[in-house]
Amino acid sequence: MPEKLQVAIVGSGNISTDLLYKLQRSEYLEPRWMIGIDPESEGLARARKLGLETSHEGVDWLLAQDDKPDLVFEATSAYVHRAAAPRYEEAGIRAIDLTPAAVGPAVIPPANLREHLDAPNVNMITCGGQATIPIVYAVTRAVTEQGGTVPYAEIVASVSSSSAGPGTRANIDEFTKTTSKGVQTIGGAARGKAIIILNPADPPMIMRDTIFCAIPEDVDRDAIAQSIRDVVAEVQTYVPGYRLLNDPQFDDPSINSGGQAVVTTFVEVEGAGDYLPPYAGNLDIMTAAAAKVGEEIAKESLSLAGGAQA
C-alpha cells in the first residue's frame, strides 16, 4: 500500500508556508505541490527550494496534472474555496479547508474528528474556535456524564494585532458568528457567544483566551477540572504551546452570572515558530490542527487501502 498520501497546498501565503513545514515532518503526508497566484510569492519560492512542484496558475493548473493529490489543504479565501470544492470532489480529492467557506463539516480534533474522517471536505472553523471549543467540549462532556447541561458558554479570544492580517480584520463579524455556532454545535453549549480582541501591544503578546461556561450548581467540579486537563493534554499532542494559565476557576451562582454557577478557564497558545513567529499562536493552532486532521485522515485511508490489498 502507499506509505503516504500525496498532498497539495493551495495558497502560498504565511499560513500555507507554515503548514508546509509542519507537513514535512508528517509520517503519513507527503507535500508535493504548492499552488498560488503570485509568481513572486515567498511561499512558492520556499516550496521550490524544498523540492515541491509549484505553480502560480492556481487550481486550474493543479487539476490539469496527470498525477493528482489525494488530499488538498486550502488556505486561500472563502469564495475561492467555494468555487474549487466541487471540482476537488469531482476529481476524487479530499479537502481540508482553512478558509471561512465552511463547505464541509467543521472539525475540532479532540471533539469530533472521528465523526468526519470519511467526509470529502472538512472545515477548520476559526483560530478562536480551535483554541476554545475544546474547553467548552471538555466541560460539556463532564456535565453531560452527570446528567446536566451547559446552558451558555462564552469565549473571548485575544490575539496580537500584528498576527491579524487584512482577511481577519475584514471578517470579524464572520469570526464571531462562526465561532459562536461552533461553541454550540461542537462544544455542546445550548447558547454560545464569541468575542475577538486585537491586542496592539508591542512587543506582540501571544494568544490568550478566556472561556466561561455556565454549569449546574451541584455538578462534580473535580470531574470538570479533570476533563479540561485531559482535553488540554490532547491538544498539546499537536500544539505543544497550548496550555492552561491556571486551574479552572469555579464560582457559585450570583446575580452577575444570571443565577448560574460558572467555570472559567484561561488558556494561552504559543506557536511553534516553524515559519510564523511564536506570538502568532492563533495562526499556528490553525495549521497544527489542520495537519492533525490530515494525518488522521491519512491513517484511516492508508489503513483501508492496506486492508483492501490484503
Swiss-Prot record:
Biological process, per Gene Ontology: catabolic process
Report the superkingdom from the record.
Bacteria
What catalytic reaction does the record list?
A: acetaldehyde + NAD(+) + CoA = acetyl-CoA + NADH + H(+)
The residues that cross the membrane are none
Q: Which Gene3D superfamilies match?
A: Dihydrodipicolinate Reductase, domain 2, NAD(P)-binding Rossmann-like Domain
Name the keywords, alphabetized. Answer: Aromatic hydrocarbons catabolism, NAD, Oxidoreductase
Q: State the active site.
A: C127
EC number in record: 1.2.1.10
Asked if Amino-acid biosynthesis is a keyword of the record, the answer is: no
Which CDD domains does the entry mention? Answer: ALDH_C (cd23933)
- Binding positions for NAD(+)? S12, G13, N14, I15, S163, A164, G165, P166, G167, T168, R169, A170, N171, N282
Tell me one GO molecular function of this protein: NAD binding
**Which HAMAP family did the record assign?**
Ac_ald_DH_ac
Question: NCBIfam families under this entry?
Answer: ac_ald_DH_ac (TIGR03215), PRK08300.1 (NF006157)
| Stated family | Belongs to the acetaldehyde dehydrogenase family.
- What protein am I looking at? Acetaldehyde dehydrogenase 1
